A protein has these predicted regions:
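H-loop (His-switch) and adjacent beta-strand-loop-beta switch element
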Residues: 153-169
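Conserved H-loop
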Residues: 137-144
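A short, proline-enriched helix->beta-strand linker immediately N-terminal to the Walker B motif
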Residues: 104-108, 137
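Conserved post-Walker A segment of ABC ATPase nucleotide-binding domains
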Residues: 1-63, 126, 132-137
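Hydrophobic anchor residue at the start of the ABC signature
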Residues: 93, 99, 127, 143
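Helix N-cap at the start of a conserved alpha-helix in ABC-type nucleotide-binding domains
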Residues: 121-122
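ABC-fold ATPase nucleotide-binding domain signature/coupling loops
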Residues: 11-18, 68-97, 169-170, 176-179
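Catalytic Walker B motif of ABC-type/P-loop ATPase nucleotide-binding domains
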Residues: 110-114
Length: 179
C-alpha cells in the first residue's frame, strides 16, 4: 500500500502525538519474514540491538521467542557460532532468533512482518502468547496470512486492494474460518 496523501503519526494513550520521521524509528523493533541472522555467535547476533545486554537478558529474550530450547541443547549455548544468514539453523530457528533480538531491543512497538511464517502453528502461538505476556503495555503489530494468530489479537485489520478495514470481533472470528 503506497499512500498518495495524508500524514502518519502515533498517538499515545494519553492523547499525545508523535510525528513519524527518522527520529521516531527508535520506537520500533522490526522483524521481517526473511532471514536476518549474521555470522558470529548467537550472543553477538543478539547484542546487535543492545551491546550492553547481559547473558541473562539474552536468555530471557530467547525464552520469549521459544528459541532457548534449541540454543540450550548446544554445549556452547549462546556462544554457539552460526553462519551468515543463519547457516546451521533451520528457517524457523533463524526466525525465532530474529524475534528474540527484537524482544531484547524492547522498543515500545514490535512489528512482526510474516516473521513467524517458518514456524509450526503451535510454536507460532506460543511465541505470540509469550510476547503478549512479556509486553503487556506495548504494541505488537503482526502481519500474517495465517488465521491461527488472529484469535490472539485485540484488534484485527484487513487490507484488501489498498483499503484498510478494522474487523469487529464477529468479523474477526469469521475471517479465521474464511482463510
Amino acid at each position: 500500500v503506497h499512500p498518495d496523501s495524508g500524514t502518519c503519526f502515533l498517538r499515545a494513550s494519553d492523547g499525545s502525538e508523535v510525528e513519524m520521521n527518522a527520529d521516531s524509528r527508535s520506537m520500533f523493533s522490526y522483524v521481517p519474514q526473511g532471514n536476518t541472522v549474521l555470522s558470529g555467535t548467537i550472543a553477538e547476533n543478539m547484542r546487535l540491538v543492545r551491546e550492553d545486554a547481559t547473558d541473562e537478558e539474552i536468555i530471557n529474550a530467547l525464552k520469549v521467542a521459544c528459541a532457548w530450547d534449541f540454543v540450550s541443547r548446544n554445549p556452547a549455548g549462546i556462544n554457539a557460532k552460526v553462519g551468515e544468514r543463519g547457516r546451521g539453523l533451520s528457517e524457523g530457528q533463524a526466525q525465532r532468533l530474529a524475534i528474540a533480538r527484537a524482544v531484547l531491543r524492547d522498543a515500545p512497538i514490535l512489528l512482526l512482518d510474516e516473521a513467524t511464517s517458518a514456524l509450526d502453528v503451535e510454536t507460532e502461538r506460543n511465541v505470540l502468547r509469550n510476547i503478549i505476556k512479556q509486553r503487556p503495555n506495548k504494541t505488537c503489530i503482526v502481519t500474517t496470512h495465517r488465521p491461527t494468530v488472529l484469535s490472539l489479537c485485540k484488534r484485527v485489520y484487513r487490507v484488501v486492494k489498498g483499503t484498510v478495514t478494522e474487523l469487529d470481533e464477529e468479523e474477526s472470528a469469521k475471517s479465521v474460518m474464511d482463510f
